[in-house]
Every structure is written in structure tokens, then in C-alpha cells.
Regions:
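Intrinsic disorder/low-complexity segments
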Residues: 1-87, 117
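Terminal intrinsically disordered/low-complexity segments used for targeting and assembly
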Residues: 84-158, 206, 217, 241, ...
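Small/polar-residue-enriched beta-strand and adjacent coil segments characteristic
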Residues: 93-98, 105, 138-139, 144-155, ...
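Alpha-helical heptad-repeat coiled-coil segments that mediate oligomerization/polymerization in large
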Residues: 300-303, 465, 472, 507-511
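Hydrophobic, well-ordered secondary-structure elements that form the walls
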Residues: 368, 402, 430, 447, ...
Length: 557
């Protein structure tokens, strides 16, 4: 629809003749527009979005002649009533966290499983987490009391590229929330237009009093708003917000994984340092044994076979030492990469694996749902999928758009920004899809199935999390028992070696018996070191399985 506005400065008789006329009808035809132009009226191009049918108010110069399709008061009341409808409840199902099965206590602590309904007393997506004082908090790696590990861990948060990538992904998701929320508000635009126009002197209904050349100065603004009657926009905001929270949880999970991998690699490296030191000490002992055997052979007190056996054992242990160096270099490179060091110059001086293994506070299984970021991410993704159902359902309802324009138009700069040059209009449009061959039904069903799939993914993440904790607990329990047995084996092997070595030096036994005893001692000592290193790595695995001190209250609101 075109809008007709006064340009001013026309004969009074023309204004009287036009009084009460329906300008909008005349503006629809070329002849009518020409007639209006001849009487000092201007037809503006519609500045509303395409397809919008606005309610127009028309006025002639001086405001004498006017045609109002609807009473302005009634229109404003109707628009206000429509605006109030934006507070209606959004269509589609409201979200509640999927049900899950949680044990009362972990199996490794000796309690049975019970079915727990999804805790949601306040109607929110999460129950309030109440971590006890004994729970892991913040820099959990500090419980190991290793300052070099602390320095490496602290570097991750500021330098790791993978973590920065996760941060940028979260920030992009957060921006999507802002973009979705902006759709709740009107859009505003404004701009001037200054043109000089010439019309044909031979146009229909022209007169000698009608100018053929004139200026057209327009300053106009417009506003457009889609009231969220059915909640489509609110559901979009809900989906974007849940997706952003899922992204934040995934970022926390990346951070947890990196810190845990750093600690695991570090303790594995320290275990190899201990293995290397053991092998170096063994090489020194075997070199002494070889020298002794060679002297005895030269004195006729031992055989050449004993010398060969001593030489073989020495070279075997030297080869093992080289192999440990290969594995250590790989862990050192992995640590340098995680901490974003230049691995061509990065190095960690050898040091023994020291300190008692710290106790990791468990909490109760129901708290695990609030403490693991991967569970939080899966749950938030389920929320986002649920919101998509509401978006799909809203397609069954009409789309309503409100619009308004206002400004000034004149042929004379001196009268441009004045009351008689003002123009304004209000409009509304409702669009309802009548036939889509079942597309909306299909999209709604798709959204529901997507939600169910995401809900099952959440449940699977929960079950896998409990398995992860139980695996780490059982590993720690078994390794602790194995460490005790292995210490006894080391003590027995040490005693056997001492006896054999003394007997050999006293000429009572052959070197083969010493060699057998020393091989058994080396194997048991190496096994003991490996068990201790695995216990530290399993301890880190338990920390990771428990969420590393994170909890769902850290999600952005």
C-alpha cells in the first residue's frame, strides 16, 4: 500500500474539493496518483518490509483534508492488546532433566544401587550442588605436593591452544544467545533522502498550476517488531542459552582432560626416571660383578662361561636402560606440547617418584551428576534439543509483525522539519501457512526424536561416568594390594641375592646362582616401581572421573 502525504502550498479550493476523499484508493492507480500530485499531494514509496499491509493515516496541507481508515485510538488499543499477548506461555514442552539411575554408594565402597528419580524440586534443570569441605576444589593437582607439576599445570590455562579453541567456541555460542535474544526487541532504522524530480508536462490530468520540476526532501524512520506470541523466539533463546552452557561445560571438560593428561604423563615420566635410576644402579653392580668374575677367571677360580654370563647380563640391562630413555622422551614431548613449550628446547630434569599417594575425596554418587562437565554438557544439550520442539511447534501458529514509520517530507528545506511536513503510519501483518505437505509435522517429529536421542546420550554419559569411577576405584584398590605383595617379593629377592652374592664371593656357589638371584631382584624392583607409578596415574584418573573439583554451579547463568 502506498502512503500519501502533503507537500504544502496548494490552493484552498483544492483542499476543500479533496476533503473526505479516500486518498489510498486514488493512490493505487497511475491516474489517481497524477491527480493527487496535481493537487499538491505526494505518494511515498512504502518503506515497510515486503508484504506488510500497514494502516495508513493521510493528511493534506494544513491538515484540512484527511482520511483515516481506522480510529487511531482503536488501533493503538488493539496493538497494545497484541503486545500483552507476548507474555503468553511458549508452545512446546517445558524441559525437565531426563531420569537416571544412581547408586547410593560406589560399589568399591560396599553399598548397593537404588533408583533415584531426577531431582528437580525447584523446576530448574539442575539441583543445587552442595560440595563438602573434603571435596576437590580448584587446583586439584596441588594435593600431590609436587611444585614442578604445579608449574606445568598452571601454564595450561594461559598457553594451551586446544583450551583456547574451546574458549572461542564457547564465546561464539554466547554471542549466539545475544543474537537470539535481540529478536525479542523491535528493529529501528532511519535515514534521509534528498532528490530532485521532473515529471512530464503531458501527464494525465496535468494542469498549468502543477509543477513539472521540484525537490523532494525526506527524513523518515521505521520500526518493525514481531511479538513473540507463541514463544518461538523465547524457545530460540532457550536453545541458544542451553547450547552456550553445553559449550561452557565442554570447555571445562577439555580443561579437566588436559590437566589430567598432564599429571598422568608427568607421573609416568617420573616412574620412568625411577626405572632408569634402578637400571643405572644395576649396571654399576653388574660392572662390578663382571670385574670380579674376570679376576676369578684369571686366577683359575671361575670359568669362562661365568664371565660370558656376567657380560650378557650387563648388556641386557644396558639395553633396557636405553629403551626406558625412548619412552621417557615421548612423555617429555607430550608434556611440552600440552604446556605449549617449544619441545625442541624443552626438557625436564630427571627426579625420583616421591611422596605418599594422597587420598582423593569421593563424595556420594548423586553428586557426580553435578561434578562432571561431560555430564553437564550432555544434559544441557538435551535442554537445547527440547527447546527445538517448541520452535517446531510454533510453526503451526501465524506470524504477526507490527510496523511503524514516521518522519518529515517537503520540497523546501526551510519547511522540511516542521509540523505540516510530518508523516507517520502504523501497520500490522499476520501470515499463516495453509499447506506444506506435512513438512511442519515432520519437522516436529524430527525435533522430538532428536530430543529423545539426546536424552539417551545424557543417560549413557551418566552410566559411563559411574563406570569410570568404579574402574579407577577398583584399579587403586587392586594396585594397593599388589604393591604390598610386591614389597614383600622385593624384600625376599633382596635377601636371596645377598645370600647368593656372599656365597659366591666365599667360593661356595657358582656365579649362575648369583645371576639368577640378581635377575629376580631387578625384576621385582622394576615391578614395584611400575606399580607405584600406575597408582599415581590411577589416582589422577579417579580425580578426572570425579570431575576434578568442577560442579554445575560454575555454568554461566
Amino acid at each position: 500500500m502506498a502512503a500519501v502525504h502533503s507537500t504544502g502550498g496548494r490552493a484552498a479550493e483544492n483542499r476543500v474539493a479533496l476533503k473526505g476523499h479516500d486518498f489510498s484508493r486514488a493512490a493505487k492507480t497511475p491516474i489517481g496518483r497524477a491527480a493527487l500530485a496535481a493537487e499538491g499531494m505526494r505518494v511515498l514509496k512504502d518503506t515497510f518490509p515486503q508484504g506488510l499491509k500497514p494502516i495508513r493515516f493521510y493528511s493534506a496541507a494544513g491538515g484540512t483534508a484527511k482520511a483515516v481508515p481506522f480510529q487511531s485510538a482503536a488501533v493503538l488499543v488493539a496493538l497494545c492488546a497484541l503486545a500483552l499477548l507476548t507474555g503468553c506461555k511458549p508452545v512446546g514442552p517445558n524441559y525437565s532433566r531426563p531420569g537416571y539411575q544412581a547408586p547410593a554408594l560406589y560399589k568399591e565402597t560396599g553399598a548397593s544401587s537404588v533408583i533415584v528419580p531426577p531431582p528437580n524440586p525447584a523446576g530448574g534443570a539442575w539441583t543445587a550442588a552442595n560440595p563438602s569441605d573434603g571435596m576437590l576444589k580448584g587446583k586439584w593437582w596441588e594435593i600431590y605436593g609436587d611444585h614442578e607439576l604445579d608449574a606445568l599445570e598452571d601454564r595450561i590455562d594461559t598457553t594451551n591452544v586446544q583450551l583456547r579453541q574451546a574458549l572461542e567456541t564457547y564465546l561464539a555460542a554466547r554471542d549466539e544467545v545475544s543474537a537470539a535474544r535481540a529478536n525479542l526487541y523491535p528493529t529501528l532504522a532511519a535515514g534521509p533522502s534528498i532528490t530532485h524530480e521532473k515529471t512530464s508536462a503531458n501527464r494525465p490530468l496535468s494542469s498549468s498550476a502543477s509543477p513539472t520540476s521540484y525537490n523532494d526532501l525526506v527524513l523518515e524512520g521505521e520500526a518493525s517488531w514481531e511479538p513473540d506470541f507463541w514463544g518461538r523466539i523465547r524457545r530460540s533463546v532457550e536453545a541458544a542459552h542451553a547450547t552456550a552452557q553445553a559449550s561452557a561445560a565442554e570447555m571445562a571438560n577439555v580443561s579437566l582432560s588436559l590437566h589430567a593428561e598432564m599429571a598422568s604423563d608427568y607421573f609416568s615420566l617420573r616412574g620412568l626416571d625411577a626405572q632408569a635410576q634402578l637400571l643405572k644402579d644395576t649396571v654399576a653392580d653388574l660392572e662390578g660383578q663382571l670385574n670380579l668374575t674376570e679376576r676369578l677367571f684369571k686366577g683359575g677360580l671361575d670359568t669362562q662361561a661365568a664371565v660370558a654370563e656376567a657380560q650378557t647380563q650387563l648388556e641386557t640391562v644396558r639395553a633396557q636402560l636405553v629403551d626406558v630413555g625412548v619412552a621417557r622422551a615421548e612423555f617429555e614431548h607430550a608434556i611440552g606440547t600440552i604446556a605449549n613449550y617449544d619441545i625442541s628446547t624443552f626438557g625436564i630434569p630427571p627426579a625420583p617418584l616421591e611422596g605418599p599417594l594422597p587420598k582423593v575425596p569421593l563424595g556420594v554418587p548423586s553428586q557426580l551428576l553435578e561434578r562432571r562437565p561431560d555430564i553437564a554438557a550432555a544434559e544441557r544439550q538435551a535442554d537445547a534439543a527440547n527447546a527445538q520442539i517448541g520452535i517446531a511447534v510454533s510453526a503451526f501458529y501465524p506470524t504477526i509483525t507490527l510496523g511503524a514509520t514516521g518522519g518529515f517530507e517537503s520540497t523546501n528545506p526551510g519547511t522540511w522539519i516542521q509540523g505540516p511536513s510530518s508523516l507517520w503510519s502504523l501497520g500490522a501483518q499476520a501470515t499463516e501457512l495453509l499447506f506444506d505437505a506435512g513438512q511442519r509435522h515432520a519437522l516436529t517429529d524430527q525435533a522430538r526424536h532428536t530430543y529423545e536421542a539426546q536424552a539417551d546420550a545424557y543417560r549413557n554419559t551418566v552410566f559411563s561416568a559411574f563406570q569410570d569411577v568404579e574402574d579407577q576405584l577398583s584399579t587403586l584398590r587392586i594396585l594397593e594390594a599388589e604393591a604390598g605383595v610386591e614389597q614383600q617379593a622385593v624384600a625376599a629377592a633382596q635377601n636371596s641375592f645377598n645370600i647368593s652374592d656372599a656365597s659366591y664371593k666365599g667360593g661356595v656357589t657358582s656365579y649362575l646362582q648369583v645371576l639368577t638371584a640378581e635377575t629376580a631382584l631387578l625384576q621385582n624392583q622394576s615391578t614395584a616401581i611400575g606399580i607405584e607409578s600406575r597408582r599415581f596415574v590411577a589416582s589422577v584418573g579417579l580425580v578426572r572421573a570425579l570431575g576434578g573439583g568442577w560442579d554445575a554451579t560454575q555454568l554461566p547463568k
